[in-house]
Amino acid sequence: MKSWSTPAPPTVPSRPDRLRLHDTATGRTRHPGNDGRRASLYVCGITPYDATHLGHASTYVAFDLLHRYWRAAGLEVAYVQNVTDVDDPLLERAEATGVDWRALAEEQTDLFRADMAALEVLAPDHYVGATEAVGLVVDAVETMLAAGRAYRVPGGDGEPEGDVYFDVRSAQSATDWRLGQVSAMDLDEMAAVFPERGGDPDRPGKRDPLDPLLWRVHREGEPAWDGRSLGSGRPGWHIECSVISRAHLPAPFTVQGGGSDLRFPHHEFSAAHATAVDGLPLAHTYAHTGMVALDGEKMSKSLGNLELVSRLRARGVEPVAVRAAILAHHYRSDWEWSEQVLTDAQARVTRWRAALDGPHAAAGVAVLDAVHAALSDDLDAPRALEALDAWAAGTLPGLVETAADPVPVVDVVAALLGLRLR
């Protein structure tokens, strides 16, 4: 599947700060990418309908900061993102609107690509649809069945014979993975959110209510692929990310990213499936973004309370202002989108642009030091923007000493923050 195009970031001098990133799984600070010359990143992609709302955009802009930070440090970065281009919510939306599910997925994925390019999100090296990874899924599920890490559920109660589920208990007894080690949730928390996030705890024949689906055998009217010994059907949700990441990244890779609503079950079981197949952890560090609200509630496809990047662009809103509005909030915080947030961001962009014609436009070292230090501290973008405010006001420390520095501020801001002011 094709990705999108974004200009290469300007080159800026490296800095000695070491990245500190919060790891959801342990609750501790990690230093990903500080121990070598390579880093790898997997960010879970969209299910292509209602693209691209501000919750999506906030997540991809956040991990774009990490990508840019590593690249500015001189690391060779491998970045992979998936597209869940076949899944129940997509099929339900297609049926409700009378659109072919493939046409809906293609249209919304194209829209997502355009939005990401407009927001200056650096493109992944591999952009992979779930439908492109079916063969890899079949390989993995057959391996788990043979090892006793998965099982077939009998038919009945209107369900056909042969759906394959992951055996949580067997996996825990035979591998180093333990339920909750990625999500840092207890059983009560997991049980509460599982049915809200695609789980089916009451499915007859399951060995444990939390066992997730690996392979859904064909139902009338649903798309299906050749599953060899599994029978005709389609992948479950979590397994797609397990196999796509394994196909394109080291095992384990450096950082798994996504929204906080993916902690469980998605990231928990993506990690479990990968370990059940080859015995290796999925990732070293798990990082999650906060939720974006609108009108007092989490922005959600199911609720329909969405602000779309494409809608803002159609209104004539500058994408750089949308990106600045997102960066004004720490990536791990929950926050609320509003017109005032956008107005404030546009005003900041206007001030920064005016300062590019002022006496400190070449004071790149002072700005670089401040922005890099902020991003080194758990990608603290709000602090980085405050440094830009201080630069524009002429109050950032070091401006006098570095006023003749050859590093343009405009390059620093574009390279590290993805804000193209010119």
Swiss-Prot record:
Leading EC class: ligase
Chain span(s) of sequence motif 'HIGH' region: 46-56
Top-level taxon: Bacteria
A biological process term (GO) from this entry: cysteinyl-tRNA aminoacylation
Keyword Calcium assigned: no
Sequence motif 'ERGGDP' region, location on chain: 196-201
Catalytic activity: 1D-myo-inositol 2-amino-2-deoxy-alpha-D-glucopyranoside + L-cysteine + ATP = 1D-myo-inositol 2-(L-cysteinylamino)-2-deoxy-alpha-D-glucopyranoside + AMP + diphosphate + H(+)
Enzyme Commission identifier(s): 6.3.1.13
Residue sites binding Zn(2+) per the record: C44, C241, H266
Binding of L-cysteinyl-5'-AMP, residues: C44, G45, I46, T47, T59, N82, V83, T84, W237, G259, S260, D261, V292
Keywords, in A-Z order: ATP-binding, Ligase, Metal-binding, Nucleotide-binding, Zinc
Known partners and oligomeric status: Monomer.
Functional summary from the UniProt entry: Catalyzes the ATP-dependent condensation of GlcN-Ins and L-cysteine to form L-Cys-GlcN-Ins.
Protein name, as recorded: L-cysteine:1D-myo-inositol 2-amino-2-deoxy-alpha-D-glucopyranoside ligase
Organism annotation: Micrococcus luteus (strain ATCC 4698 / DSM 20030 / JCM 1464 / CCM 169 / CCUG 5858 / IAM 1056 / NBRC 3333 / NCIMB 9278 / NCTC 2665 / VKM Ac-2230) (Micrococcus lysodeikticus)
